[in-house]
Amino acid sequence: MSKRILAAVVTVLSLTAFSPAFAATTSTHVLLTTSAGNIELALDDQKAPVSVKNFVDYVNSGFYNGTIFHRVIPGFMVQGGGFSSDMKQKATNPPVKNEADNGLRNLRGTISMARTSEKDSATSQFFINVADNAFLDHGQRDFGYAVFGKVVKGMEVADKISQVQTENVGPYQNVPSKPIVIQSAKIIKK
């Protein structure tokens, strides 16, 4: 009898140990080295695979190196990943599917895909929420903005960026008066 119980316990434990629900969550980590300091991101490979792959492809190609945070709004977010320091927009890969319905929320410290008013228009640009922004979540007012990770180190840097003096540059508003440059973006953990 005790051998059967032991066998049953071993079987149940082995099934749950190898179940995806019990698997250790892995996330890709990216280090953004900026002129304002470093920001480390943990990307949610499981809930936002399309957005994470898109972001990682841009990181691996060196696309973000030399781009700026071109739109910063205190108490809201800091946006970057699409413009050079002279406010020239960089050519991007095709847009990706919007994953805003993945259950992740636009909370302080999360990173999301920026897009136009078109649902599936996100390319390279992203933003870091410096406040809880529930109105950007799926279904609040439209499809929403896809969260695909979070800041795990350097949130004080994002906060500092959000407080810099801004100005209008041509048609663009909320542009830092002194460029905040992403000097490099690289994968540090997979």
Swiss-Prot record:
It is found in: Periplasm. Transmembrane segments: none annotated. Its EC number is 5.2.1.8. It holds the Pfam family Pro_isomerase. Residues 1-23 form the signal peptide. It catalyses: [protein]-peptidylproline (omega=180) = [protein]-peptidylproline (omega=0). Gene3D superfamilies: Cyclophilin-like (2.40.100.10). InterPro entries: Cyclophilin-like_dom_sf, Cyclophilin-type_PPIase_CS, Cyclophilin-type_PPIase_dom, E_coli_cyclophilin_A-like. Keywords: Isomerase, Periplasm, Rotamase, Signal. It comes from the Bacteria. Belongs to the cyclophilin-type PPIase family. NCBIfam families: PRK10903.1. PPIases accelerate the folding of proteins. It catalyzes the cis-trans isomerization of proline imidic peptide bonds in oligopeptides. This is Peptidyl-prolyl cis-trans isomerase A. It comes from Dickeya dadantii (strain 3937). The lineage of its organism: Bacteria, Pseudomonadati, Pseudomonadota, Gammaproteobacteria, Enterobacterales.
